[in-house]
Amino acid sequence: MANELEQLVLKKAQSWLDGHYDEATKKQVKYLMDNDMKELVESFYKDLEFGTGGLRGIMGVGSNRMNVYTVGAATQGLSNYLKKNFAGERVRVAVAHDSRNNSRMFAERVADIFASNGFQVFLFDALRPTPELSFAIRELKCHSGVVVTASHNPKEYNGYKAYWTDGAQVTEPHDKNIIAEVAKITDVDMIETGKNPENITILDEKFDEIYLNKVHELSLSPESVKKHHDMKIVYSPMHGAGVRLVPASLKKFGFTNVIMVKEQAVIDGDFPTVESPNPEERKTMAMAIDLAAKEGADLVLATDPDSDRIGVALRNKKGEYVLLNGNQTLVLLLSYQLTRWAERGELDGNQYVVKTIVTSQMANAVAEHFKVKCYDCLTGFKYIAKIIRENEGKAKYIGGGEESFGYLAGDYVRDKDAVSACSLAAEAAAWAMDTMGLTLDEWLQALYVKYGFYREGLVSVVRKGKEGAELIQKMMVDFRANPPKAILGSEVVKINDFQTLETLDVKTGAKTAIEQDRSNVLQWFTADGTAVSVRPSGTEPKIKFYFGVKAPLASVADFDKTLAELDAKIEGIKKDLKLE
């Protein structure tokens, strides 16, 4: 079997040596053929899959790697679909990229192919936040767009995300149709290149101003910022695309004391100061938190390399910096927006917010308090964008997000936006201090007293290879056939199955329809308010378990004790479900 695979791989590699590929690529392929069969197999044993979100993979030569040829095939396939879909129109597209190695080269390749296909292309002059690409598609009335990024993946990776006319990532039926067109590009000679460079328009800082002005329209408390303009804010762009625009946005909001983490303000696709540029991880935030402690900063903000995810750390009463999880950041931003909209008399029953089904139920409680509709959708910002699209002209979107550190305020962008989220987090801190004399950490605890203390946890069970994929599938089949009757002693009263799109009332046996997109996700809800969601990852060999528990918080004085109890409860649930 191994020999058979090696023969196929060698044949495929030889086709690269014989085909119209550049000499440097051929040289690398030849080197692997002669010296590293293992790496050659990894690089050629399959084609890098254009999935529902686009491409993501390790950079290198070969059909299973991110390189100008695989990026080229994806772009030609997308171009062919755009021509079919918008026949008779001059197709307009926007192209952006992050700080990763080769991102500029890939973005220029994408722009060249689009231009060679006769499209009007808007290419940013340098790296930009992903949300600005989404904004550009809408602002410049484009039919599509591409951003070259692998978000917060390790440095070896790069990726390619495709967007549609509304500035959101492509969804059905377009995603499947684009995948089919990309699959038809079987030869490098099918890719159009080197024509019509005049079709490319470069976007520069003038366009940034249009975007930043739109972000600034989200401001809700300019008076509070005036009083606390010199609040110390430490910011890290994690060597990425937020480096210019996040500080520029904070300045536009009125903040005058933003301290950059200098070492992480260097644009570098190797991300030399972090293992992985993911603001979800405390060790990634360590440099920013250390600087904040040294400076006595009130707030720590960070963005991932394409500046769509936000990391937030707050100083507590003991002077320690507490790293918020994505649920806490979402609850704070949502509470701030809804409180200010209510105080300004702007809530009239025609507004709504959105969260994903695995994001904290506390967001639902906050929305309910303000009599604002809260939609729950599948994991992924494209589903939040879909709800915004469906409500256009009917109701007003305020904000929303997901537990994985993504938030979007306002509907002028259709993907998560850490530029606006950073500015709103800073403004919320100024407002809380100005109106209540509270830090954001203290206000979050006050919200727990008001709505209940919600606490979340996550476990990822990794099962690699073909066997692993089968095991994950079997786990889901078993969970459907034999769901737990109780979790940590509390009876399971409701089950949501997003595969069958049914909710089961366990006591009565009654089933009701779930109005949602279909997905392989299960949720169990217990009598004591615990929620457990089970979801196999769409992109990695893992199955994720999301836990949500809650308890009343009588007063802030009980915070530490209740926190310990809730964390212990989450650990107990993991053991009960045999995940530990």
Residue map of PLM features:
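Short acidic, glycine/serine/threonine-rich loops at helix termini
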Residues: R104-R109, S134-R138, E156-A162, A183, ...
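Gly/Ser/Thr-enriched, mixed-charge loops and adjacent short helices
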Residues: W16-H20, M37-F44, L48, N158-T284, ...
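An N-terminal, well-structured beta->alpha segment
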Residues: N3-V110, T201-I233, A241
